Swiss-Prot record:
This is Small ribosomal subunit protein uS8. One of its GO terms (cellular component) is ribosome. InterPro entries: Ribosomal_uS8, Ribosomal_uS8_sf. Signal peptide: none annotated. Keywords: Ribonucleoprotein, Ribosomal protein, RNA-binding, rRNA-binding. Part of the 30S ribosomal subunit. Contacts proteins S5 and S12. The keyword Cell membrane does not apply. Belongs to the universal ribosomal protein uS8 family. It comes from the Bacteria. One of the primary rRNA binding proteins, it binds directly to 16S rRNA central domain where it helps coordinate assembly of the platform of the 30S subunit. GO terms for molecular function: rRNA binding; structural constituent of ribosome. NCBIfam families: PRK00136.1.
């Protein structure tokens, strides 16, 4: 069966693994998921990610990040734009997550960017997710 929303599946796996204090989580690989993982790593929400060969296709493994006393680095994740209801933001009206403490991940003509990067470049796009 095909997956209708691979990004939502990725975020759900990440949320569930984070809640269960797992050290890593695996999922089917795609370029879009790898770019989302790049943003999460650059913003300090995950420790790293790697692409691995599986029996069928490839898989993406995210290494979760925790504080010294096993505090979660990700407090929450929310999918915003869904296949049934796309959500777009203009460059003049970009979302701010928790007053700037979290990030919004946008799909723009310049690739995947955070809300801060999109604001600096002056581009808008589809709001994929909020992470805080």
């Amino acid at each position: 069966m095909t997956m209708t929303d691979p990004v939502a599946d990725m975020l759900t796996r990440l949320r569930n693994a984070n809640s269960a204090y797992h050290d890593s989580v695996s999922m089917p690989y795609s370029k879009l998921k790898a770019r989302v993982a790049d943003i999460l790593k650059a913003e300090g929400f995950i420790a790293g990610w790697k692409e691995e060969d599986a029996e069928v296709g490839k898989k993406l493994t995210l290494d979760l990040k925790f504080g010294p006393n096993r505090e979660r680095s990700i407090a929450g994740v929310r999918r915003i734009s869904k296949p049934g209801l796309r959500v777009y933001a203009k460059s003049t009206n970009l979302p701010h997550v928790l007053g700037g403490l979290g990030i919004a991940i946008l799909s723009t003509s310049s690739g995947l960017l955070t809300d801060k990067q999109a604001g600096k470049k002056g581009v808008g796009g589809e709001v994929l997710a909020y992470v805080w």
